[in-house]
Amino acid sequence: MNHPSELKYARTHEWVKIEGDLVITGITDHAQDELGDLVYVETPEVGSQVTAGEQARVVESVKTASDIHAPVSGTVVEVNTDLEDDPDFVNEDPYGKGWIYKIKPDNIADVEKLLTNAEYEAGL
């Protein structure tokens, strides 16, 4: 499994990358591998509030549907509209083309409360 060291991780299998005053998030390589081929990614609405640890949306695969949780609290400022036509980007490149949404966090310091890649991998 690939879990880049420059990212932070939630126990619920989401990753976070800081980009200026925003955070980009998606599901981890482990999560996409467990789900199998994704067929649908439901993204949150731009402008909606998300709360850390709570369900933000759902991904559906040929095997099952799974909740996506918000890794930090904040406002959704952008979603990856490419996933509407190509949800398999999450399987092919979960940390690149497969990002799901961007959040303007209520407190950027909350990212530091998330797991390192070593801590995340130890919990798998």
Swiss-Prot record:
Pfam families with a match to the protein in the record: GCV_H
Protein's UniProt keywords contain Cell division: no
Cofactor note: Binds 1 lipoyl cofactor covalently.
Classification via InterPro entries: 2-oxoA_DH_lipoyl-BS (IPR003016), Biotin_lipoyl (IPR000089), GCV_H (IPR002930), GCV_H/Fam206 (IPR033753), GCV_H_sub (IPR017453), Single_hybrid_motif (IPR011053)
Gene3D superfamilies: 2.40.50.100
Required co-factors: (R)-lipoate
GO terms under biological process: glycine decarboxylation via glycine cleavage system
N6-lipoyllysine modification, residue list: K63
Keyword Metal-binding attached: no
A cellular-component GO term for this protein: glycine cleavage complex
Keywords annotated in UniProt: Lipoyl
Lipoyl-binding domain: residues covered: 22-104
Function: The glycine cleavage system catalyzes the degradation of glycine. The H protein shuttles the methylamine group of glycine from the P protein to the T protein.
Similarity section: Belongs to the GcvH family.
Subunit architecture: The glycine cleavage system is composed of four proteins: P, T, L and H.
The name this protein goes by in its record: Glycine cleavage system H protein
